[in-house]
A protein has these predicted regions:
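Short amphipathic alpha-helices within nucleic acid-binding modules
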Residues: 29, 87-92
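Short, charged/polar, Gly/Pro-enriched secondary-structure boundary elements
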Residues: 57-62, 122-125
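Short hydrophobic/aromatic beta-strand micro-patches
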Residues: 17-19, 54, 80-84, 128
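Core segments of cupin and vicinal oxygen chelate
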Residues: 10-11, 17-59
Length: 131
């Protein structure tokens, strides 16, 4: 019996898809409030658009996609952004009218400070203090 290799050529997470009800409103939120860069906005398929936003300097992007049949918006995405200063980001997003948790969670070492926030569709995302 021969061994089966479990090796792949996967090297990173490239794109995470986040379902949104309106791509223009999503761009206003992710670019205008979060400060991400719009890195793609092009026709896709039959009348659809492929819209991507990316944190500055990051290799992983978010695709802001319209939900397919049976999919919903307003989900817990499990997307976590890294930040060098979660307290400053919490304050800034709150000032911009973003739906953020009341305060930054602090559970003690080794768990870093973090907070959840919601986009214009209620999709739940997280910002975590980097190392």
């Amino acid at each position: 019996m021969s061994e089966t290799s479990t090796t792949t050529h996967i090297s990173q997470v490239g794109t995470v898809m986040v379902p949104v009800s309106d791509q223009d409103l999503a761009l206003d939120f992710y670019v205008g409030k979060l400060g991400l860069e719009k890195t793609a906005d092009t026709p896709f398929g039959r009348g659809d658009r492929w819209v991507e936003v990316t944190p500055r300097g990051a290799q992983t992007s978010l695709a802001l996609i319209l939900p397919q049949e049976g999919e919903e918006v307003g989900i817990s995405t499990r997307v976590a952004f890294a930040s060098d200063d979660v307290d400053a980001d919490h304050a800034a997003l709150s000032e911009r009218g973003v739906d953020v948790d009341e305060e930054v969670m602090r559970m003690g070492d080794p768990i870093p400070p973090m907070f959840f926030f919601r986009d214009q569709d209620g999709n739940r995302l997280l910002i975590v203090q980097r190392g």
